[in-house]
Amino acid sequence: MPTITLPDGSQRSFDHPVSVLEVAQSIGAGLAKATLAGKVNGKQVDACDVIDTDATLQIITPKDEEGLEIIRHSCAHLVGHAVKQLYPNAKMVIGPVIDEGFYYDIAIDRPFTPDDMAAIEKRMAELIDKDYDVIKKMTPRAEVIELFRSRGEEYKLRLIDDMPDEKAMGLYFHEEYVDMCRGPHVPNTRFLKAFKLTRISGAYWRGDSKNEQLQRIYGTAWADKKQLAAYIQRIEEAEKRDHRRIGKQLDLFHLQEEAPGMVFWHPNGWTVYQVLEQYMRQVQRENGYVEVRTPQVVDRILWERSGHWSNYAENMFTTASENRDYAVKPMNCPCHVQIFNQGLKSYRDLPLRLAEFGACHRNEPSGALHGIMRVRGFVQDDAHIFCTEDQVKKEAADFIKLTLQVYADFGFTDIAMKLSTRPAKRVGSEELWDRAEGALADALNESGLAWEYQPGEGAFYGPKIEFTLRDCLGRNWQCGTLQYDPNLPERLDASYIAEDNNRKRPVMLHRAILGSFERFIGMLIEHYAGSFPAWLAPTQAVIMNITDKQADFAREAEKTLNQSGFRAKVDLRNEKIGFKIREHTLLKVPYLLVIGDREVETRSVAVRTREGVDLGSMPLEQFAAQLQQAVSRRGRQDLE
């Protein structure tokens, strides 16, 4: 009979097969009441599942991250229960867990409205209050098919067809409603009280716009009402910081239907963009990169040789001319190999670091586009390092150091680093993978910072390092990457003359720090709520006169600051000074300079910040020196 080993090493023996819940009951009533599911020998199971052999067991409760996922998945099923009660003709599709929530795709003959969402949420709350048990039944495949056929759930039947090897399937019953799932799920609806439906959108069956359109209901669920309230508050703050809203408020950019996924940069936004580009250009030059420029439109022959045509063609914009097929480049890598291939390269030429602010275009689905965060036309701070295998560790270590410095300059210091290792389907010998993963791991260790493995998440040809930033709202943004690639040099016949006078393939390290400029600027807008640090602000200082008598000195102050390399503007409108101050505060200009008669006499400016802090009156030269200090600190000003 089973002996159960618990996480603390203690053991409990039973004289009969025992469920996860029964083990929890043997430990204590409090734990039993909180039990959602279990992990038996590392595998998640339902609380009702029976253990009949010796095993390790971890009880999963709402306090566990895995517990939250189970709550959210069960809430998705609860959406199905409520929808089928309110709209019996609706057909249920899929309801997975996503980051901080869940959704359910539903086929129905009309779009859901906000009133529908409110009704569904109300019915879900009523069902939760019934505290009914969720019943699991492992059911033979034929019976599952017959059940869903009798209920007219055609999408469930299609999903079953996708799993030909499954002989039995888990059915989860919410009273009269039933759904198919691997589980686990909550044992009772009392665990689902802290939920909220958040929005409705359209979706396509299997994510393909050629298929029928579905309605997608999004929601979130948490362990308790306190966590839910904190999440709602965070989402409300995120909405206030939405880069699309602030982009319009600060006149940074716009998007329009005639160019979906393409950004129209306005002067203010283009200023921010140029500051980023000039900064990255300087950083890369100081770290041994040489800048190149490659064509936007390239013959399909190159994309076929690189492998992109067979694997990525549907995401490429194509055109034809004079009986030749071309593609607008979706990435820069094959073109950089062409530059490397010009002229004979020696081991003495390596490492060669080619950088490009490369404009790329990808035919993203229209439903996936999101402001400037997810676009079709974008520019990357892209670079490729061609090096020997022995140079990989140092190049990776230098890149990690550089990347963390850049993020700190933008005000990001909470960085997660992950090493994605060999997937099941891969090319190359085990020895090559060992060396590649070892070099990247050693480089990460040299940083002195914590990092973690992502087993099996590497590309089929090599491991990679990923950098994820956490912003002021606690959201994670995956930005930087370093990808080890011996494959593309092989496909595109890149080589160098080694010390032994034989030709060898270089290792190619694909790397980016910001990712796309568009997405990174969107992140900065939301992180700072539009209140950019002085070095990034489109206008760093605005000079305002009180009356026309101070206009000449105001113009002189503007000219002096601009000639000193700052971005200053003058506001000479015949408006009250309070009105001007309020307007430029709303425009989030870092420094507001007021000039009255006394300032003209003393050739000074009265300085206040956009936060309303009065810095007093000071000579213009002194203000310029202080502004220079703020600019020099970049985004580190709040971190020191």
Swiss-Prot record:
CDD domains from the UniProt entry: TGS_ThrRS, ThrRS_anticodon, ThrRS_core
Domain of life according to the entry: Bacteria
Required cofactor names: Zn(2+)
Listed GO biological process terms: threonyl-tRNA aminoacylation
E.C. code: 6.1.1.3
Any one annotated GO CC term: cytosol
Span list, region Catalytic: 242-533
Reactions the enzyme catalyzes: tRNA(Thr) + L-threonine + ATP = L-threonyl-tRNA(Thr) + AMP + diphosphate + H(+)
Location relative to the cell: Cytoplasm
Assembly mode: Homodimer.
Protein name: Threonine--tRNA ligase
Classification lineage: Bacteria, Pseudomonadati, Pseudomonadota, Gammaproteobacteria, Pseudomonadales
